[in-house]
C-alpha cells in the first residue's frame, strides 16, 4: 500500500451461503453472500498477544513468547542480552511512529486501532472498516460504529502512543525496576520520532528537500496548508497531486502577482 508496510490479500473465496449484515450499524440489515479473505503477513503477533498473557498472569508463557518473537523476527537483537526487551521495545516504538506517520501522509485511516490490531512488527493489519481522506477532514472516521471518533484520522498518532504504553505495561513482569524506568523514557521519545518522520514525509510531498531537521517555519507551513485544505474542503490526495504539476516559474509568477 503506497510503500507502507501492510499485510497482503492472497485470495478471496465466495459462497452462496447467505449472511446478514448491518454494515452501517443503523438497523438496515441486508442479506449478502458469505466470503472469506485470506491475508498474508510475516507474523500476526500483536500488542494484544502479549497483553493477554500479562493480564492472565502467564509470565512464563509471556517470557517464552517474547523470546520466540525476538529470535524469529528481530534478528538484530540478541535474545540472550539482559537488555534485549528494552531493545525490542525501542525498535517497536520507532517503527510504530514511522508507520503512523506514513498513514497520515497518505490520508489513511485504519478504523479500529485497538491493541489487538497493532502489529508487533509495525505493519498495517486488520483494517476492516478503513478509509482514505477525500476532502481533508482531520475528524474523519471510516468506522460507522465509532460514534465518539476515538480512532479518527487526527487521533491516530496519540492512539499509537496509547497502544505502545499498553505494550510497555505488558512487558513489565519481565523487566527490572531500572529497565521499567528506561522503558518509560523510551516511550517518551515516541512523539519526537513521529513528528520528525511526519514532517519529512509532508515536506517531501511538497517537493522540498527531505532533511533530517526541520524548522518552526516548516511546521507552520504544513499546518497552514492543512488548515486551508480543511476550510475549503480540498481533496487531500488531489491537492498534492495538483501542486506537483506546477513549475517553479508558475509559482514565482504567482508570488509576484500577489505582491
Predicted regions and their residues:
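Alpha-helical scaffold segments in soluble metabolic enzymes
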Residues: 64, 68, 98, 102, ...
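Conserved ATP-binding subdomain of kinase catalytic cores across diverse folds
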Residues: 1-82, 121-125, 151, 161-164
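Beta-strand segments within the central parallel beta-sheet cores of soluble alpha/beta enzyme folds
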Residues: 9-13, 114-117, 183-188
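Catalytic activation segment of kinase domains across protein kinase-like and atypical kinase folds
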Residues: 27, 31, 105-110, 114-173
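Conserved kinase catalytic-core helix
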Residues: 3, 92-106
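Regulatory N- and C-terminal appendages and interdomain linkers associated
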Residues: 148-259
Amino acid at each position: 500500500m503506497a510503500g507502507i508496510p501492510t499485510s497482503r490479500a492472497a485470495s478471496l473465496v465466495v459462497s452462496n451461503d447467505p449472511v446478514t449484515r448491518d454494515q452501517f450499524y443503523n438497523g438496515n440489515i441486508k442479506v449478502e453472500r458469505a466470503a472469506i479473505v485470506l491475508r498474508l503477513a510475516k507474523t500476526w503477533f500483536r500488542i494484544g498477544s502479549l497483553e493477554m498473557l500479562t493480564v492472565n498472569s502467564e509470565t512464563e508463557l509471556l517470557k517464552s513468547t517474547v523470546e520466540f518473537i525476538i529470535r524469529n523476527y528481530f534478528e538484530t537483537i540478541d535474545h540472550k542480552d539482559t537488555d534485549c526487551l528494552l531493545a525490542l521495545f525501542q525498535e517497536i516504538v520507532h517503527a510504530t511512529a514511522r508507520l503512523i506517520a506514513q498513514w497520515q501522509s497518505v490520508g489513511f485511516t485504519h478504523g479500529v486501532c485497538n491493541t489487538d490490531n497493532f502489529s508487533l512488527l509495525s505493519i498495517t493489519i486488520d483494517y476492516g472498516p478503513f478509509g482514505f481522506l477525500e476532502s481533508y477532514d482531520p475528524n474523519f472516521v471510516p468506522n460507522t460504529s465509532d460514534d465518539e471518533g476515538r480512532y479518527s484520522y487526527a487521533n491516530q498518532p496519540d492512539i499509537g502512543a496509547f497502544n505502545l504504553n499498553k505494550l510497555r505495561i505488558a512487558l513489565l513482569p519481565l523487566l527490572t525496576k531500572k529497565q521499567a524506568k528506561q522503558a518509560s523514557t523510551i516511550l517518551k521519545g515516541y512523539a519526537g520520532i513521529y513528528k520528525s518522520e511526519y514532517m519529512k514525509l509532508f515536506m517531501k510531498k511538497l517537493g522540498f528537500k527531505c532533511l533530517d531537521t526541520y524548522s518552526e517555519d516548516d511546521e507552520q507551513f504544513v499546518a497552514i496548508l492543512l488548515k486551508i485544505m480543511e476550510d475549503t474542503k480540498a481533496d487531500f490526495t488531489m491537492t498534492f497531486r495538483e501542486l506537483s504539476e506546477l513549475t517553479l516559474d508558475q509559482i514565482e509568477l504567482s508570488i509576484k502577482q500577489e505582491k
